A protein has these predicted regions:
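Short Lys/Arg-enriched alpha/beta "domain-start" segment
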Residues: 1-16, 27-29, 33, 39-44
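Nucleotide-activated chemistry modules centered on ATP-dependent adenylation/adenylyltransferase
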Residues: 1-20, 51, 56-63, 69-114, ...
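Solvent-exposed strand-loop boundary residues in beta-sheet-rich modules
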Residues: 23-25
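Short glycine-rich, basic-tinged beta-strand/loop micro-motifs
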Residues: 28-34, 60, 65
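Extended acidic/polar, glycine-enriched regions
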Residues: 38, 44-53, 66
């Protein structure tokens, strides 16, 4: 896979950086557009390495960058390759060559965090932190969700601006065609997300020297997935430090938002099941979030969700996977603490149906399936253990 013909195009207040990407059977021009005030200097192709490394491993090619790349990032590439290949042994162990290594030039002072309005990002943009310090910018990326129509994309930006206003922080809106390149090669964005967000972060290194990636993992479920505390920070350079935020369960994040920043609840949007800027209320992500809100006594404050839980959808849900099961167990005890035993019983039923399901299954061939592989193997191990009498799901 070859990266060449880096280009810069300036339009009004925006700067677009792009490069031609070529591989056996494919050719694509990848771009990212950012406001001028945060745009990275031209000639630095470090971000393209972050975006393309997993793709090169998937197509079985080495990565040749005919431009300059951060020395620090190049030194960490073998470790990133080791992680990816350990998580999916089908991957080619790609080598990366750059035309030139960049000398350190110093980092900008800005501190940013991605904002999609999901539970993870809403918690990350609101919670106080010591390192890397208080946020100075929030970042919303247009076109990162392929399902979204033009009208929904515009509404997503409007709502992200309103949420940023509640937080008293400026919103940086950026744009990219990254998913048009990655989806045909790595079909599951969850496998790609750490490298993809690092690509976007590097494009803003002219104004942001530190960027936080919201954590989707819980403290006890830091397992292989495309965005991980084991992985994300290794995409850093001397000019840009990338932080994977502190892990916490989603029910705990929701409870914190209810306690500390309830004014943000109307902006929560977790649903990617449909082309909409609010939430369907029926998909697993919606049900998990609505149950977490109900357990905190605040579902009606989150006005982008239906006001009532869809009990028929919950009655059909079978919760599998290490992290979903941990979060549903937490939701169950939080509901019981509030005296919501009937709803807690429905949650327990979803856990029981998931435990009764087979741990085996065919892994997809259109993506590395890091998380699915790890959870399948973990569920197999649990299923092989002898169960004591009276053991729960």
């Amino acid at each position: 896979m070859i990266v060449d013909q880096l280009g810069t195009r300036e339009r009004a207040d925006d700067v677009e950086r792009s490069a031609r990407i070529r591989w056996d059977g494919g050719d694509f021009r990848l771009f990212v557009s950012t406001p001028r005030r945060v745009a990275a200097p031209s000639g630095d192709a470090s971000g393209f390495v972050c975006a393309l490394l997993l793709l090169a491993m998937r197509v079985g090619e080495d990565l040749e960058v005919r431009s300059s790349v951060s020395r620090r990032l190049l030194e960490r590439v073998p470790r990133i390759v080791d992680l990816y290949a350990t998580w999916d042994p089908r991957l080619h162990r790609s080598r990366v060559r750059a035309e030139q290594e960049l000398e350190p030039r110093g980092a900008a002072a800005g501190v940013g965090c991605f904002l999609s309005r999901g539970v993870d990002s809403m918690h990350s943009v609101a919670v106080p932190r010591g390192l890397p310090g208080a946020l100075t910018e929030l970042v919303h990326c247009d076109r990162l969700e392929p399902k979204h129509s033009v009208a929904v994309r515009a509404e997503e930006i409007r709502l992200a601006r309103e949420a940023a206003r509640e937080l008293g922080l400026p919103l940086v809106v950026i744009d990219t065609n990254l998913r048009e390149l990655t989806d045909p090669i790595v079909a599951d964005w969850a496998d790609m997300v750490g490298g993809g967000l690092a690509f976007l972060a590097h494009a803003m290194a002219g104004g942001l020297g530190h960027v936080v990636i919201p954590s989707s993992a819980a403290p006890t479920t830091v397992i292989p997935t495309g965005s991980s505390p084991m992985l994300d920070a290794m995409f850093s350079s001397d000019e840009l430090e990338i932080y994977h935020d502190a892990p916490a369960t989603r029910p705990a994040k929701v409870a914190w938002l209810v306690r500390e920043r309830a004014e943000l609840l109307p902006y929560l949007k977790v649903c990617f099941h449909e082309d909409r800027s609010d939430n369907c209320g029926r998909c697993p992500k919606c049900l998990t979030t609505m149950l977490s809100l109900e357990a905190a006594g605040a579902l009606r404050l989150a006005t982008a969700f239906p006001p009532e839980l869809d009990r028929s959808a919950l009655a059909e849900l079978a919760v599998q996977g290490i992290q979903p099961r941990e979060e549903f167990r937490e939701i169950e005890w939080r509901l019981r603490e509030r005296g919501a035993d009937e709803l807690a019983g429905l949650v327990a039923g979803a856990l029981a149906r998931g435990a009764a399901g087979p741990p085996d299954g065919e892994l997809p061939t259109d993506s590395p399936a890091f998380l699915a592989r790890a959870e399948r193997d973990a569920m197999r191990a649990l299923a092989s253990q002898p169960r004591s009498r009276g053991a729960g799901p």
